[in-house]
């Protein structure tokens, strides 16, 4: 029939449900008398946004393009990065009313078959009317829907999605959403940036260390300040203690009211700066914080050192690469503040222990959230900090991939004259013997 209809994308359809589905997504259906088969011709021409640079995951050195709302554009972008016949892209629809098109992408020679089967099982067993975005789908297929911790990675960058595909993960694309879902994921994935693989390992590890410090400051600093000023003044140097007491002398409120008021005010400023148009939003954020902080100190509502604590905490929260992990830290931070006010270091220790228990019990598609640390899977001690690119020989062992090895033990064969040359010495212009090899 392709010889009769000059169209590249022609498919046979024999059931009315398939025919109606194709009509709804904009295909043209051709019926021929005396033939019991309809021909679905891809003739749709929806308007769509062109490929643009990433808005939220910007990098200095890396690809400057992002996913769009069109599923076929997104799959072609992934196919361009992973130009291999083993890349499988399976289509399915979700939602009894919207019939939203989704694509499940994986490398069939790398990804674990049980992982792929589990992802497809969850997607095919959703009894729901509509799915509009990948964020809605994420809430339906994650392991623990009541936990505020993110359990899947979400990205707008095709190069990041391609990197995770090649490591053995599964990528799910939802039509109408410029963000794709990557599964499974572990905790350290949320502290990694899309730019890390493009940097030398020294630079990337410095940034990873800074993010790790920012994580603990964002989580613990306000609670520790409350605990120390309320219960553990003896650990503060004498001069600093006198400065703190003097700064709080004219403040009429207890420390818990003071810090909660400033934290909530900071969250209000952050939310306001996001919701207004971008040129005004930056101005509101800067001016609002300056005016509010200065006025609060002059009116003796809060102490100057508390303004510093809240400002440092707010700045470090912006250093967390993943938006959803940053949200989780902003919520849990209030629990640490209250625990520090009620019981000092003991209260913070109890909340921290409970937090660790939650992290240890959480799974993402059967993979422990704290892998490869808990459980310790690992011959591989390069779980968080990155080794040099030439030394990243194995894929993550907790993914149980079909091909654990991704690089040869000696990947830079040119350096040792391996392959097609009998000289095994490193090349040097100063060594005349090399020129004769």
Task: Label every PLM stretch briefly.
Residues 224, 237-240, 245-419:
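Generic detector of multi-pass transmembrane helix bundles and their immediately adjacent loops
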Residues 1-255, 365-394, 400-435:
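Cytosolic regulatory modules rich in charged/polar residues
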């Amino acid at each position: 029939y392709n010889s009769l209809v000059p169209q590249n994308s022609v498919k046979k359809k024999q059931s009315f449900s398939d025919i109606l589905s194709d009509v709804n997504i904009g295909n043209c259906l051709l019926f021929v008398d005396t033939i019991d088969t309809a021909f679905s011709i891809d003739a749709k021409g929806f308007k769509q946004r062109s490929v643009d640079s990433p808005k939220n995951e910007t990098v200095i050195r890396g690809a400057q393009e992002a996913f769009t709302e069109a599923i076929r554009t997104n799959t072609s972008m992934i196919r361009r990065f992973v130009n291999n016949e083993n890349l499988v892209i399976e289509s399915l629809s979700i939602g009894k009313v919207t019939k939203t098109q989704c694509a499940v992408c994986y490398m069939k020679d790398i990804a674990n078959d049980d992982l792929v089967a589990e992802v497809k099982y969850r997607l095919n067993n959703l009894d729901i009317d509509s799915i509009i975005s990948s964020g809605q789908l994420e809430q339906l297929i994650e392991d623990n829907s009541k936990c505020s911790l993110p359990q899947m990675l979400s990205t707008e960058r095709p190069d990041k999605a391609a990197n995770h595909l090649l490591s053995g993960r599964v990528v799910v694309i939802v039509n109408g959403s410029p963000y794709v879902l990557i599964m499974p994921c572990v905790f350290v994935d949320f502290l990694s940036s899309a730019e890390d693989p493009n940097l030398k390992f020294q630079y990337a590890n410095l940034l990873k260390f800074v993010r790790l410090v920012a994580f603990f400051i964002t989580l613990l600093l306000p609670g520790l300040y409350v605990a120390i000023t309320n219960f553990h003044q003896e650990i503060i140097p004498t001069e600093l203690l006198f400065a703190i007491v003097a700064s709080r002398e004219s403040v009429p409120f207890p420390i818990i009211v003071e810090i909660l008021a400033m934290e909530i005010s900071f969250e209000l400023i952050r939310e306001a700066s996001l919701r207004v148009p971008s040129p005004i939003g930056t101005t509101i954020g800067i001016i609002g914080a300056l005016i509010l902080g200065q006025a609060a100190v002059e009116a003796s509502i809060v102490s100057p050192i508390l303004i510093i604590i809240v400002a440092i905490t707010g700045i470090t929260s912006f250093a967390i690469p993943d938006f959803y992990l940053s949200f989780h830290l902003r919520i849990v931070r209030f629990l640490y503040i209250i625990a520090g006010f009620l019981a000092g270091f003991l209260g913070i220790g109890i909340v921290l222990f409970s937090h660790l228990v939650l992290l240890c019990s959480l799974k993402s598609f059967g993979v422990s959230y704290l892998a490869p640390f808990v459980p310790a899977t690992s011959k591989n001690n390069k779980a968080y900090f990155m080794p040099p690119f030439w030394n990243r020989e194995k894929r993550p062992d907790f993914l149980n991939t079909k091909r654990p090895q991704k690089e040869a033990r000696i990947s830079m064969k040119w350096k040792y004259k391996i392959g097609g040359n009998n000289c095994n010495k490193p090349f040097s212009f100063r060594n005349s013997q090399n020129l004769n090899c």
